[in-house]
């Protein structure tokens, strides 16, 4: 448990067999692409409520067992293409309370086990073409899209 420790980077020497990593409420503004390298057994990860502005490509590539990912309460403005592609076992993704304006086409397509995604309280820009992917994805997966209370979100809200 590394929450609320004023950390500015992921601590070194995290055991490779770690299953749960709680890094919420720290002082991260960025994460290096190798921050979670070797943590192939990780099933639960929270880097929520930091000040992370962007995610590097490849950040989650080795987290092939990850089931829950909490990124809410940061300052994410965009997501790199393919950032979630290796997370095929993911069942929950929280992206609410960021500054996202759109998501890359196909961002959630490989998340075939996803049961819950939270996208509320972002700054969605409905004038950009990229928002069409998100709108269509939400319409096709509306039962998975939840608000902050866990209730299904109205797909017409996007």
What is each stretch, according to the model?
Residues 91, 95-126:
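Repeat-solenoid scaffold signature
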Residues 116, 121-158:
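Membrane-proximal C-terminal cap and juxtamembrane stalk of leucine-rich repeat ectodomains
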Residues 1-44:
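LRR N-terminal entry segment and analogous cap-like coil->beta motifs
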Residues 1, 19-23, 42-47, 66-71, ...:
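Conserved hydrophobic beta-strand positions in leucine-rich repeat
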Residues 5, 26, 50, 71-74, ...:
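Consensus "Asn ladder" position of solenoid repeat domains
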Residues 8, 14-17, 29, 37-42, 52-53, 61-66, 76-77, 85-90, ...:
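Leucine-rich repeat
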Residues 9-13, 31-37, 57-61, 79-85, ...:
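Recurring C-terminal helix/loop segment of individual leucine-rich repeat
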